[in-house]
């Protein structure tokens, strides 16, 4: 779907030329099929194979082990930046759009072109676009809130008949999201009043029986990171007048100052033998607070579609990498902001302050996860009690009942008591490795 959207974009009269750089990250057969599809769509395509990536790995600050078929974000972005810069400069491109492969190009391509033109004319260096649909966070950090929604919905459904109408979700959910940013996020620091506020799942069905059937059929997608019950609404506002300084970069970024792709490394601290997550944010902080570039966020929206993603095989690993990466970014950004724009090395006291804050923030966020884990375990127990008896199969059919039991079994496995103990030991071990200090010393 992303390639189809890019092909649509090339038909816009405002697009002179589009160069597509594809980074191999996955099975060789799958990558070959993607490249072939891009060329079928007549997209000017530059394919970057694993061999190509290995050729520049050390020069880019990576080790050969980073260049695998399942790369960490820091490695993927570092390589993407390098090859995109080479193509953009050789082909005379004046803007780079860096996207994750699961986002979708907006249908209104004329408005997209107009917005990019306006952002470029505003003399911005980097624009961090917004994401709607499923959030760009580990699946394990959006389970608890969705279980709250599922439990409330099923508790209400069991009191109704199969043909009873379903409550509309639009106005109710709009109240809960108004003025909130992280209403979908189990580890939210600010919008904690939405953690236990049930949202009404956005379902197509209009009767209770059909709605329950539809919802239950989607529950396993929560483990793949889909926002089944709390999708992110598209950001509202004007891309220029509502732009604001930010370093919270994700999978939708416009870069107008192309030299930043070579000058600023997109690396992250290495813990447990691999880079942690949030390297994009560290990159944005360096661009803004070391080099003084204009880095902003704007309601330049794309939808993230995780419907083709598989359930995460090791959700705790990705979650811990995210907690540690965010903690380091937040600490690093805080110290850089406090000292003012400067590209000089951190003083000894500043370096120690980063390390102190990073450990503090990591422990705070893991504490939030601890609460979330045990709350999810309790919600799983409540869900099991809610669906006892035959009401679910009577209301939505035997298949729905079987799907629900499968989902409950998966919850029991993911939120077993011993699982959290293993996760806590992994977190403590990674935090004690000294990778934060090593990164600052590079």
PLM segments and residue spans:
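Conserved catalytic core of nucleotide-sugar-dependent glycosyltransferases
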Residues: 106-267
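Short, acidic, metal-binding catalytic loop of nucleotide-sugar glycosyltransferases
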Residues: 2-17, 27-28, 41, 121
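Short beta-strand-to-loop acidic/aromatic patch adjacent to the donor-nucleotide binding site
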Residues: 90-106
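Acidic/polar loop patches that form or flank catalytic/metal-binding clefts of enzymes
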Residues: 294-300
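Terminal low-complexity segments of carbohydrate-biosynthetic enzymes
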Residues: 260, 301-442
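Active-site-proximal specificity loops/subdomain of glycosyltransferases
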Residues: 30-93
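Phosphate/oxyanion-binding active-site loops and adjacent basic polyanion-contact surfaces
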Residues: 1-2, 69-77, 249-252, 280
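Acidic donor-binding loop at a coil-to-helix junction in glycosyltransferase catalytic cores
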Residues: 276-282
């Amino acid at each position: 779907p992303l390639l189809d959207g890019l092909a649509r974009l090339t038909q816009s009269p405002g697009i002179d030329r589009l160069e597509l750089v594809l980074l191999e990250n996955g099975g060789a057969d799958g990558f070959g099929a993607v490249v072939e599809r891009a060329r079928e769509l007549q997209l000017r395509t530059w394919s970057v194979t694993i061999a190509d990536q290995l050729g520049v790995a050390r020069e880019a600050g990576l080790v050969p082990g980073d260049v695998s078929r399942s790369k960490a974000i820091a490695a993927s972005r570092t390589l993407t930046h390098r090859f995109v810069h080479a193509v953009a400069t050789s082909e005379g491109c004046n803007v780079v759009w860096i996207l994750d492969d699961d986002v979708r190009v907006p249908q209104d391509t004329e408005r997209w072109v107009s917005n990019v033109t306006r952002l470029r004319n505003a003399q911005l260096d980097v624009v961090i676009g917004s994401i709607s649909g499923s959030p760009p966070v580990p699946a394990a950090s959006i389970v608890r809130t969705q279980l709250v929604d599922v439990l409330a919905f099923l508790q209400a459904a069991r009191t109704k008949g199969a043909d009873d109408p379903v409550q509309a979700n639009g106005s109710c959910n709009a109240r809960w999201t108004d003025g909130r940013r992280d209403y979908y996020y189990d580890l939210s620091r600010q919008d904690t009043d939405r953690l236990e506020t049930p949202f009404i799942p956005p379902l197509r069905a209009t009767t209770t029986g059909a709605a329950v059937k539809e919802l239950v059929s989607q529950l396993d997608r929560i483990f793949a990171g889909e926002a089944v019950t709390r999708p992110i609404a598209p950001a509202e506002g004007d891309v220029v007048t509502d732009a604001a300084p930010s370093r919270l970069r994700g999978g939708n970024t416009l870069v107008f100052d192309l030299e930043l792709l070579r000058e600023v490394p997109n690396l992250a601290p290495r813990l447990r033998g691999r880079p942690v997550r949030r390297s994009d944010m560290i990159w944005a902080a360096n661009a803004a607070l070391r080099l003084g570039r204009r880095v902003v966020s704007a309601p330049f929206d794309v939808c993230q579609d995780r419907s083709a993603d598989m359930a995460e095989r090791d959700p705790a690993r990705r979650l811990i990498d995210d907690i540690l990466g965010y903690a380091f970014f937040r600490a690093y950004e805080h110290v850089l902001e406090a000292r003012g724009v400067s590209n000089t090395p951190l003083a000894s006291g500043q370096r120690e302050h980063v390390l102190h804050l990073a450990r503090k923030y990591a422990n705070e966020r893991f504490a939030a996860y601890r609460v979330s884990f045990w709350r999810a375990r309790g919600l799983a127990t409540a869900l099991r009690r809610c669906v006892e008896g035959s009401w679910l199969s009577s209301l939505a059919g035997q298949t729905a009942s079987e799907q629900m039991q499968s989902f409950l079994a998966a919850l029991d496995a993911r939120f077993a008591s011993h699982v959290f103990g293993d996760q806590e030991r992994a977190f403590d071990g990674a935090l004690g490795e000294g990778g934060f200090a090593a990164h600052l010393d590079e």
